Amino acid sequence: MKFPAFITAIISIASLSSAISVSGAAEGFAKGVTGGGSATPVYPSTISELVSYLKDSQPRVVVLTKTFDFRGSEGTTTGTGCAPWGTASNCQLAINKDNWCTNYQPNAPSASVSYDNAGVLGITITSDKTLIGQGSSGVIKGKGIRIVSGAKNVIIQNIAITDINPKYVWGGDAITLNNCDMVWIDHVTTARIGRQHLVLGTSASNRVTVSNSYFNGVSDYSATCNGYHYWGIYFAGSNDMVTLKGNYIYHMSGRSPKVQSNTLLHAVNNYWYDISGHAFEIGAGGYVLAEGNVFQNVPTILEEDDGQLFTSPNSNTNQVCSTYLGHVCQVNGFGSSGTFSSADTGFLVNFQGKNVASASAYTVAQSSVPSNAGQGKL
């Protein structure tokens, strides 16, 4: 039986609407986030529609069904930057953003740079938004996303953000949070990024959960000139509580994560694999509890610790967690990796009364995270 075209279209739209919804719910500090809630899903077809939906003042569920390629949409800039990390073909170059080369790398060789303007600043996402991909189809290429300027109640799920000026430091970040609250990033893949895969800026990002995501550091260019991306994850907020759970952090050479300023980080059941430099870098004001994680082929798990760190070192010491987190902390697992042992407990009281993610044994993360993290793995 053949249906009239308009009936077929109605059925197709209804099927899409019913099929697209947020999977699961945020654990940890962003528990209770609803994003666009029950708003009727919208399906942008152009980059301008996508930008418009994400920045308007209405609650929205924005569904990506294809690749939105921003490269070339805002022109290119050619100028003089610098080569602080070397002049080999696989070394990243730096854009002279805000005279960074001039002021901070005066002895670095000058270098010609030509970068895509769209990548430098991400798409602004305002309050009460859900950005979700359909299947493995939702990709934003050449531009990141920004949840800033007081935005609250945002969900990002099941998308990929890729190819943001990967040759150039200051070429753009994949995900930026700054001055926001109640943000859940889930099943997101990032790859081939110029600067940070994920950055929480110096203003408070408050309550954030990052879960089941895949931070892929494989790149033709890197600051360490070896194909391992250095600028991974940077938490620098003035009043941040971050749950980092079930993520796959792969092929990085540093800052994975860097934690400082006034950030309380619960790193639980993540999998770090093939990190050529260091994973954690903890500056002053960084408070990190790490439990149930896997470190495989990570020679230097901790480069610097000027904050406070509890690594859940053994079953006896881990009993203290039950008072503050409501469960006994899980030991971490290690394979061909360096040491990671610290038992600062003074900051654990900061977890008391908060929404704290559950923790499984590291063997659960070992078997499940690589195959379940990232876009298309809901």
From Swiss-Prot:
One of its GO terms (molecular function) is pectate lyase activity. It catalyses: Eliminative cleavage of (1->4)-alpha-D-galacturonan methyl ester to give oligosaccharides with 4-deoxy-6-O-methyl-alpha-D-galact-4-enuronosyl groups at their non-reducing ends. Residues 1-19 form the signal peptide. Disulfide bonds join 82-101, 91-225, 321-329. The active site is at 255. It comes from the Eukaryota. Its main location: secreted. InterPro entries: Pec_lyase, Pectin_lyas_fold, Pectin_lyase_fold/virulence, PEL. Pectinolytic enzymes consist of four classes of enzymes: pectin lyase, polygalacturonase, pectin methylesterase and rhamnogalacturonase. Among pectinolytic enzymes, pectin lyase is the most important in depolymerization of pectin, since it cleaves internal glycosidic bonds of highly methylated pectins. Belongs to the polysaccharide lyase 1 family. This is Probable pectin lyase A. It comes from Aspergillus terreus (strain NIH 2624 / FGSC A1156).
